Amino acid sequence: KNGRVKLQNCLAMQLEVSYFSLYENQPTFGEVDTYLRTIGFLPHRFLSNKRWSIAPTIFNNDYRFPGNQLLEADVIYLRNPLQLEELTDNQLKKLVVMAHFLFESPDLCVRILIEMEQRKIIERHDHNKYISNIEKFS
């Protein structure tokens, strides 16, 4: 919570969150999610979900073999992607690059490209070119 000023210009973040506290005073995913929503961020996608066996269950003599208990995850949070009109042209350009190369999120790319078309930053129907060539770009 102490980084609120630094987050004012942040477009996206990747966080490792825990589903339950592993360390003293560690916030859980629910607490992190609630806080980030209050400052304008929404979860976009999970990059990974780590599972753990519930003790004392051990599979194949390997205590690290994943069971079904959710332990922690890597998650991408974005400034509200439904309010792209609030972003500057430069922020849109940065976000579309992140969406494609870092988040592997073509649906977000298309949404941003459409916003960029409406602002005449790129040519009309460029989002269709992206859709047609998505496999070449990936």
Where are these regions (language model features)?
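Conserved acidic-Pro-Pro-aromatic motif
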Residues: 1-107, 116
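Short, charge-rich amphipathic alpha-helical segments embedded
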Residues: 113-138
